[in-house]
Design a protein with these regions (language model features):
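Gly/Gly-Pro- and Ser/Thr-rich, intrinsically disordered tail segments characteristic of DNA damage-repair
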Residues: 1-201
Length: 201
């Protein structure tokens, strides 16, 4: 039976990555993108995360607690331009792409292992390299037999070399270890209801 496999391609700290693409000196620095002087933090570099800056932190609080961090006002036209570059790169390799946000897309890789004569993990690596080289944006890729099971490992991919795959024989274990709050599509109210009924994973 044909193996069905979906990739979730997720741009890393997308707004910050766009700022670093146009201003390379920002790479390796603690950088945050904020929604204006009276707004809040909407994107953080890895260094800013390590420093302790939280997503959604009000600008006045972030500047007070983390004065050494570089703060950039959001530039949505810039991010849309880079989003188009990323999606164009992805579509040059994978015909079936579903954009779900400015920095995220599902790609159906089913049977493309035979087209490119490689395994799916290597194909994901090729996608990452192409996007990084052409669009100058780093991405992480989760691989799984469905959209849900591609979404779950995409966060793990950020800490495991950029790619993480869930294989069919590990699905049960992965779901058992996944908190309900981490499952895409289950909102806070449903999560509370399930917890009330003793369902946590």
């Amino acid at each position: 039976m044909k193996e069905h496999i979906i990739a979730l391609v997720d741009c890393d700290s997308f707004f910050v990555s766009c700022e670093q693409a146009v201003e390379p000196s920002l790479r390796g620095q603690p950088v945050c993108v904020v929604t204006g002087d009276n707004g809040c933090v909407v994107s953080r570099s890895r260094e800013a995360k390590k420093a302790g800056v939280k997503m959604g932190m009000p600008m006045f609080m972030a500047r007070r607690e983390f004065p050494s961090v570089i703060y950039k006002n959001a530039r949505h036209e810039l991010y849309c331009r880079y989003s188009r570059r990323v999606m164009t790169c992805l579509r040059e390799i994978v015909p079936d792409v579903e954009e779900v946000s400015v920095d995220e897309a599902y790609a159906d890789l089913t049977s493309l292992d035979r087209v490119y004569r490689t395994d799916y993990t290597s194909l994901a690596a090729r996608i990452r390299e192409t996007i990084r080289r052409t669009a100058d944006i780093p991405v992480s890729i989760g691989l799984g037999p469905s959209k849900l099971l591609a979404k779950l490992p995409s966060d793990k991919a950020k800490n495991t070399g950029g790619i993480f795959r869930i294989f069919p024989d590990s699905i049960e274990n992965v779901l058992r270890e996944t908190d309900i709050d981490d499952v895409s599509g289950i909102g806070r109210s449903h999560s509370k209801l399930m917890a009330y009924n003793g369902v946590f994973t």
